[in-house]
Amino acid sequence: MDKLLDRFLNYVSFDTQSKSGVRQVPSTDGQLKLARALQQELLELGFEQVVLSKQGCLMATLPANVAWPVPAIGFISHMDTSPDFSGKNVNPQILENYRGGDIALGVGDEVLSPVMFPVLHQLLGHTLITTDGKTLLGADDKAGIAEIMTALVRLKKSQLPHGDIRVAFTPDEEIGKGAQFFDVKAFNAQWAYTVDGGGVGELEYENFNAASVQVKIVGNNVHPGSAKGVMVNALTLASRYHQQVPESQSPEQTDGYQGFYHLHSMKGSVERADLHYIVRDFDRNGFEQRKQTMLDIAEKVGAGLHPDCYIEVTITDTYYNMREQVEQHPHIIALAQQAMRDCDIEPNMKPIRGGTDGAHLSFQGLPCPNLFTGGYNYHGKHEFVTLEGMEKAVSVIMRIAELTALRAKP
């Protein structure tokens, strides 16, 4: 199990799909099964302070191998996969020396095409690990777990100087609960990095401000033959509500630093309709304005309704942009940039169009930017990762550990 690829293939065999709307953490038993397997692996490899909490958060330490004081740093990845697509019976395909063109995913009609995913043009000659078209792959974030584990093992075997290295594998990141029961004090690191990014070179310390918006619409159902002046169709109101949401500010029409409104799900009948939106914005003022827009639309569409019929909007903030926290510690970013350059990788600073455990942890006093994994197209059947990208992530983790020790040397 010393090989990076073997580790990754083992981890993706665990079904760890998280589940929204569940109060317990972790939300699924499969995550605990992987946590226990990782706990056993860490113990067998001789790591110290291996602790698994009842909420499924696993922590461990690789002790320092130098005599001088070095800041303790951490590396964190999450064990769950997205609820958006099946993570059961993952059957990875390994394609060595990719030569271009479409890649068949399994035996059906599904393909991974450079027409839809142009990044493939940059990966000629690489070893690609894909799905069989029936599930997601789980590189998000089991590639990160495999990379951290492999980096620790190699550091332990090598003579490279390093201080205390703390690692954590968390549950339920995909549903925003990954850091809810994370014990920052017990983790005892001065700063950390999540290994949960995308393509090689990605280094991220800005993420969305995020909120969940539940829109409850209550109508009045009567026989349609005698409905005039009496029926209030909740589905019609739902349609009117959504038509007021700025269409040009949807996920499929935005990128970079642009925020969005996203209708995630809807269900309903004449009597009642429920819409679930997520709103995202990098700027805090823009974020607050988006939430106000959702309230304003409800007031506009619901104007003049009978008191028994109404539109109710419930907004819950999910996480905030960690930039304001991480920018107070510029050496953390500079260190990661230097480590990448030392590994012949050009850092690609970009905003996270999503969230990570690092966002929550940064606000809990553990500054925590995000490193790449070498994976692409997360949360669906077109997800893939390159073995070369994973190896580079391992090298960067090791170099960050080494640089931290060298910079602290008297």
Swiss-Prot record:
<dbReference type="GO" id="GO:0043171">
    <property type="term" value="P:peptide catabolic process"/>
</dbReference>
<feature type="binding site">
    <location>
        <position position="379"/>
    </location>
    <ligand>
        <name>Zn(2+) 2</name>
    </ligand>
</feature>
<feature type="binding site">
    <location>
        <position position="174"/>
    </location>
    <ligand>
        <name>Zn(2+) 2</name>
    </ligand>
</feature>
<dbReference type="InterPro" id="IPR002933">
    <property type="entry name" value="Peptidase_M20"/>
</dbReference>
<keyword id="KW-0862">Zinc</keyword>
<dbReference type="Pfam" id="PF01546">
    <property type="entry name" value="Peptidase_M20"/>
</dbReference>
<comment type="function">
    <text>Cleaves the N-terminal amino acid of tripeptides.</text>
</comment>
<keyword id="KW-0031">Aminopeptidase</keyword>
<dbReference type="InterPro" id="IPR036264">
    <property type="entry name" value="Bact_exopeptidase_dim_dom"/>
</dbReference>
<dbReference type="GO" id="GO:0045148">
    <property type="term" value="F:tripeptide aminopeptidase activity"/>
</dbReference>
<dbReference type="GO" id="GO:0006508">
    <property type="term" value="P:proteolysis"/>
</dbReference>
<comment type="similarity">
    <text>Belongs to the peptidase M20B family.</text>
</comment>
<feature type="binding site">
    <location>
        <position position="140"/>
    </location>
    <ligand>
        <name>Zn(2+) 1</name>
    </ligand>
</feature>
<feature type="active site" description="Proton acceptor">
    <location>
        <position position="173"/>
    </location>
</feature>
<keyword id="KW-0482">Metalloprotease</keyword>
<dbReference type="InterPro" id="IPR010161">
    <property type="entry name" value="Peptidase_M20B"/>
</dbReference>
<keyword id="KW-0479">Metal-binding</keyword>
<feature type="binding site">
    <location>
        <position position="196"/>
    </location>
    <ligand>
        <name>Zn(2+) 1</name>
    </ligand>
</feature>
<keyword id="KW-0963">Cytoplasm</keyword>
<feature type="active site">
    <location>
        <position position="80"/>
    </location>
</feature>
<dbReference type="InterPro" id="IPR011650">
    <property type="entry name" value="Peptidase_M20_dimer"/>
</dbReference>
<dbReference type="GO" id="GO:0008237">
    <property type="term" value="F:metallopeptidase activity"/>
</dbReference>
<dbReference type="GO" id="GO:0008270">
    <property type="term" value="F:zinc ion binding"/>
</dbReference>
<dbReference type="Pfam" id="PF07687">
    <property type="entry name" value="M20_dimer"/>
</dbReference>
<feature type="binding site">
    <location>
        <position position="140"/>
    </location>
    <ligand>
        <name>Zn(2+) 2</name>
    </ligand>
</feature>
<keyword id="KW-0645">Protease</keyword>
<dbReference type="GO" id="GO:0005829">
    <property type="term" value="C:cytosol"/>
</dbReference>
<feature type="binding site">
    <location>
        <position position="78"/>
    </location>
    <ligand>
        <name>Zn(2+) 1</name>
    </ligand>
</feature>
<protein>
    <recommendedName>
        <fullName>Peptidase T</fullName>
        <ecNumber>3.4.11.4</ecNumber>
    </recommendedName>
</protein>
<keyword id="KW-0378">Hydrolase</keyword>
<dbReference type="InterPro" id="IPR001261">
    <property type="entry name" value="ArgE/DapE_CS"/>
</dbReference>
